[in-house]
């Protein structure tokens, strides 16, 4: 019982015995995987009942969600900070523990060919897709209080964006990475209500085409008139000098055509196709695309244009692929395994700092408030599709298309 002082006393006695038995030198990690409303209470009791040692380290690992908006997140952070300092708090986001996410920095800053092209002069747009084929399953109760915007965009997607848009750190250290990521998130434009409605799309899944899968509103534990979104897509903009003007398209959803998390970096097309004598717009070359596969596959793909090998000088697209083998993937620790190991080591590189969390809420809160002001016409996409038509229209408005489409 998190409200019962005697339970904390019993826990302290047990911890002291284990400390003495295994010579732990007062080192303790507390892992909080429960409703956020209990975080402050637990932190206060850990301090008042003297579970926080005065020798060794004391660390607090906290699972998401970290609040429901900026206001509740700040209240939560204030409560926890009364007992633990910022350098003792480890806000865990399992996406940051994924090998492919951690490799973004290596790709960007470890390859001159990539880093020299990673700018607004060469990149046309960036696309981030976190697609899930399953519905809400047993998480309906949680989803009714969260939705895809809070569950996926506020943390996972914005963390990925910070890694894709941050300036180069002077060193790959926790403090340097934190500062660059905070700057990156501060450079993401916070929309007005009108801009949010114009640039973000929400969806809720209906039945599949064969009527074998139920719609969201008939899942166990959901409201039959629910306004909770199971799909989000949108356009974000960064105001940093390197990528200013490059649109960042994001989407995430449940019950989509195929499970896939990937990042598509779409490069600008060549000005003219010198290999075509007609000069027709329809004969433009395919754009170069660098794809980062996060899950379930892990790897990279680069789309290039080359001569087709025929008698005439025709051009054809090719794909340079690298995918980790089963043997390679077997050596990679699971995300939580890696992050807990990092916490034991005191390595905060892949944990979210409070300033990152706060700025992410500032970006998301406006979108949530805009949606709450208007009733959505749900359900608005078929299970097994790639989301509502409005998501496709969002890019077509800018004369672009989603690179990943599992329905083709």
Provide a role label for each language-model segment.
Residues 1-62, 66-408:
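Secretory/organelle targeting and membrane-embedding segments
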């Amino acid at each position: 019982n998190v409200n019962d002082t005697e339970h904390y006393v019993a826990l302290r006695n047990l911890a002291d015995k284990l400390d003495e038995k295994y010579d732990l030198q007062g080192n303790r990690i507390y892992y909080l995987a429960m409703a956020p409303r209990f975080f402050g209470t637990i932190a206060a009791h850990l301090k008042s009942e003297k579970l926080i040692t005065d020798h060794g380290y004391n660390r607090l690992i906290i699972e998401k969600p970290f609040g429901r908006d900026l206001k509740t997140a700040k209240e939560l952070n204030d409560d926890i900070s009364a007992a633990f300092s910022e350098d003792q708090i480890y806000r865990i986001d399992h996406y940051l523990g994924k090998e492919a996410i951690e490799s973004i920095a290596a790709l960007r800053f470890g390859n001159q060919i990539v880093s020299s092209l990673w700018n607004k002069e060469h990149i046309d747009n960036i696309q981030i897709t976190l697609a899930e084929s399953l519905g809400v399953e047993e998480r309906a109760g949680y989803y009714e209080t969260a939705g895809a915007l809070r569950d996926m965009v506020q943390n996972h997607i914005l963390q990925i964006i910070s890694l894709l848009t941050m300036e180069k750190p002077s060193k790959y250290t926790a403090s340097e990475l934190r500062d660059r990521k905070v700057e990156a998130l501060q450079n993401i434009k916070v929309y007005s209500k009108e801009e949010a409605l114009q640039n973000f799309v929400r969806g809720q899944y209906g039945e599949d085409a064969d009527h074998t899968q139920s719609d969201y509103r008939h899942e166990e534990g959901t409201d039959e008139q629910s306004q909770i979104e199971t799909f989000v897509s949108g356009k974000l903009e960064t105001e940093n000098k390197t990528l200013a003007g490059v649109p960042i398209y994001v989407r995430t959803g449940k019950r989509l055509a195929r499970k896939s998390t990937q990042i598509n970096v779409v490069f600008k097309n060549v000005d003219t196709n010198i290999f075509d004598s007609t000069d027709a717009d329809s004969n433009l070359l395919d754009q170069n695309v660098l794809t980062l596969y996060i899950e379930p596959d892990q790897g990279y793909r680069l789309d290039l244009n080359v001569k087709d090998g025929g008698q005439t000088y025709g051009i054809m697209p090719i794909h340079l692929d690298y995918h980790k083998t089963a043997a390679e993937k077997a050596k990679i620790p699971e995300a939580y395994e890696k992050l807990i190991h990092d916490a034991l080591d005191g390595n905060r590189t892949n944990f979210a700092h409070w300033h990152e969390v706060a700025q992410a809420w500032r970006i998301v809160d406006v979108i949530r408030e805009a949606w709450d002001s208007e009733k959505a016409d749900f359900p608005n996409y078929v299970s097994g599709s790639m989301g509502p038509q409005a998501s496709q229209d969002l890019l077509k408005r800018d004369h672009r298309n989603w690179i990943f489409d599992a329905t083709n």
